[in-house]
A protein has these predicted regions:
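Conserved glycine-rich cofactor-binding loop
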Residues: 10-11
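Alpha-helical segment proximal to the catalytic Tyr-Lys
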Residues: 122-123, 164-168
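Active-site loop immediately N-terminal to the catalytic Tyr-X3-Lys motif
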Residues: 95, 140-146, 168, 204
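Substrate-binding pocket helix/loop in short-chain dehydrogenase/reductase
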Residues: 93-94, 98-103, 186, 197
Length: 211
C-alpha cells in the first residue's frame, strides 16, 4: 500500500491534496494542529470513498511531537509521497513586525518543514516524491506578511537544494508557489482587496484548493 504524508492536510490546499492523493490510491496520513474538525471531515470523506486515512495532531514546531509522528506505523512502513503544506500567515504590517512574530512564523513555516523532513527522511522510499508548498510571496515580498514571505523564500532555496542532492538518487523534490487561493489566508480580505487580487490574475478569478 502506497502512503502519503501531508502536513496541514486537513483543510485548504492541504485538504484538497489529501483527497486527490487518496483518489489516486494512496492511504493518507495527514497532520493538523489544534483544530481537529476540518481534518476529521477530510478523513471521513476519504474513508467514505473506500480509501484509508488517519489524522494526527502534530505541532510542527515541537520536536517531540514531530518525533512521535515519525513512530507512526505507516511511517515505519515507508512513505511514498511527502507533502510539506503546513503554514501560518498573521498579516502583520512590515513596520510592526517584531522578533517574536518573525521567529514564530519562521519556526512554523521553515523550521517545521525541516523538522518533519529530518524525522522521516530515513523512512522515504527510494523513489519518493517530495512536494513543498511555497508561495509567490516568497519571491516578491509583502507589506503585510514580510515574515511569511521570508519563510517561503527560505523554503524555496532549501527545496531546490534538496532536489539537487536527492535527484540523482531517484527522489524528486518540487516546490509549488501558489498565488491567490481561496483559503483561510484570504478570509480577512475586504471586497476591495479581493477585487484587486482578481485583477492581478489572468483568469480573473481567485484560485481554489482543487486547482
Amino acid at each position: 500500500m502506497r502512503t502519503a504524508l501531508i502536513t496541514g492536510g486537513g483543510r485548504g490546499i492541504g485538504g484538497a491534496i489529501s483527497k486527490k492523493l487518496a483518489a489516486d490510491g494512496y492511504r493518507i496520513l495527514l497532520t493538523y494542529c489544534n483544530s481537529s474538525k476540518p481534518a476529521e471531515m477530510v478523513v471521513d470523506e476519504i474513508r467514505d470513498s473506500g480509501q484509508d486515512a488517519v489524522a494526527v495532531n502534530c505541532d510542527v514546531t515541537d520536536a517531540r511531537e514531530v518525533a512521535l509522528l515519525a513512530t507512526h506505523p505507516w511511517v515505519s512502513e515507508k512513505i511514498d509521497v511527502l507533502v510539506l503544506n503546513h503554514g501560518r500567515y498573521d498579516r502583520i504590517d512590515v513596520k510592526d513586525l517584531d522578533m517574536k512574530h518573525l521567529r514564530r512564523t519562521m519556526s512554523t513555516n521553515f523550521e517545521g518543514a525541516f523538522l518533519i523532513w529530518e524525522s522521516v527522511k530515513n523512512h522515504l522510499t527510494d523513489a519518493a516524491r517530495i512536494c513543498v508548498i511555497g508561495s509567490q510571496l516568497g519571491t516578491r515580498g509583502s507589506t503585510h506578511g514580510a515574515d511569511y514571505s521570508a519563510s517561503k523564500a527560505a523554503l524555496e532555496i532549501w527545496a531546490k537544494s534538496l532536489a539537487m542532492k536527492l535527484g540523482p538518487e531517484g527522489k524528486r523534490v518540487n516546490i509549488i508557489a501558489p498565488g491567490f487561493v481561496d483559503t483561510d489566508i484570504l478570509a480577512g480580505d475586504s471586497e476591495e482587496k479581493r477585487a484587486s487580487r482578481i485583477e492581478e490574475v489572468p483568469l480573473k478569478r481567485i484560485g481554489t484548493p482543487e486547482d
